[in-house]
Curated annotation (Swiss-Prot):
Required for the formation of a threonylcarbamoyl group on adenosine at position 37 (t(6)A37) in tRNAs that read codons beginning with adenine. Is involved in the transfer of the threonylcarbamoyl moiety of threonylcarbamoyl-AMP (TC-AMP) to the N6 group of A37, together with TsaE and TsaB. TsaD likely plays a direct catalytic role in this reaction. This is tRNA N6-adenosine threonylcarbamoyltransferase. GO terms for cellular component: cytoplasm. The gene is tsaD. The lineage of its organism: Bacteria, Pseudomonadati, Campylobacterota, Epsilonproteobacteria, Campylobacterales. The keyword Hydrolase does not apply. PROSITE patterns: GLYCOPROTEASE.
Length: 333
């Protein structure tokens, strides 16, 4: 068994995964959404302090499995430096005290392997990764052969939902609330520009779309009636459709070059139902197999880290206590 730790942002999570069967023996996550919501986003120092409180509590529940463990795995990149450090510090201490090898896991590979929790790998596969920090198209041939073929030039899909929600005073995290508000809105009321629609390049951008939404909100706020609840519904609906349309346009261009046999969407923002529906239709049109993470595994969790760690364990991909470090960003897989 492998004990895995996730603390890259605002979720404290520990899991135990069986190596031979990929079975998830134990998994628990403590979210910090409530504590950060009053600030409209994640406060790194607060997140780190909350990890200090939560991780030991979760670990206490796992002690019965310690004699069965073969390795300790931990997310070491990418993420917030102060929160990554809490997980890595715990992992190093466990590695030393239990005399077990240490496995450093790429958080983004974790999101990809969230598709395979308690399942076998399906490779090669092309993946759309959408989260608060990333919007990427990735071609994965194996665990150690992954290539980013498209990325954002500024902001991410998930971050734009958080920003729109904040501008409308709807709270954090923005993804679920914007999705909920959009159900009551008119997608055609506000004419929002689809980013990079005239560009032949396969890349993403959300800064311009966020600015366009901001201008509509300011215009409504300065009107005699002010901004009404229905206005918020309509803005959310128009924004969500445009944000997803942008992704769909770029995916269609990508598929003109190469149609993969297997396609997947992963990351916290992949829980968006409208995005899932649009991609499902596109995959059916191109006869592609579509793979989706279970909704409970879309956001950050240690189960996906453990699933990657199983494959790294088989390859004896270990790292020493002295060598492991944290990285807030990574350029390639």
């Amino acid at each position: 068994m492998i004990l895995s730790i996730e603390s890259s942002c605002d979720d404290s999570s520990i899991a135990i995964t069986e190596i031979k069967t990929n079975k998830l023996i134990y998994h628990k996550k403590i979210s910090q959404e409530l504590q950060h919501s009053i600030y409209g986003g994640v406060v790194p120092e607060l997140a780190a302090r909350l990890h200090v409180e939560a991780l030991p509590k979760i670990l206490e529940e796992c002690k019965e499995y310690f004699p069965l463990l073969k390795a300790i795995a931990v997310t070491n990149a990418p993420g917030l430096s102060v929160t990554l450090m809490e997980g890595v510090t715990m992992a190093k201490a466990l590695s030393i005290s239990l005399n077990l090898p240490l496995i450093a896991v790429n958080h983004l590979k974790g999101h990809i392997y969230s598709l395979f929790i308690e399942k076998q790998e399906v490779l090669p596969i092309t993946i759309l990764l959408v989260s608060g920090g990333h919007t990427q198209i990735i071609e994965a041939n194996s665990l150690n052969d992954m290539k980013v073929v498209a990325t954002t030039i500024d902001d991410s899909f998930g971050e734009s939902f958080d920003k729109v929600s904040k501008m409308l005073g709807l709270g954090y995290p923005g993804g679920p609330v914007v999705q909920e508000y959009s159900l009551k809105g008119d997608v055609n009321r506000f004419d929002l520009p689809i980013p990079l629609s005239q560009s032949p390049k396969i890349e993403f951008s959300y800064s311009g779309l966020k600015n366009a939404v901001r201008l509509h909100i300011e215009k409504l706020e300065n009107s005699e009636e002010g901004i009404r609840e229905q206005d918020k519904y309509d803005i959310c609906a128009s924004f969500q459709k445009t944000a997803v349309d942008h992704i769909m346009q770029k995916l269609k261009k990508q598929f003109k070059q190469k149609v993969p046999k297997n396609f997947a969407i992963v990351g916290g923002a992949s829980a968006n139902i409208y995005l899932r529906t649009q991609i499902d239709e596109l995959c059916k049109k191109h006869n592609m197999n579509l793979y989706l993470s279970e909704l409970k595994y879309c956001s950050d969790n240690a189960a996906m880290i453990g699933r990657v760690a199983v494959e790294q364990y088989k390859l004896k991909d270990f790292i020493s206590i002295e060598e492991i470090d944290i990285q807030t960003r990574i350029k390639e897989f």
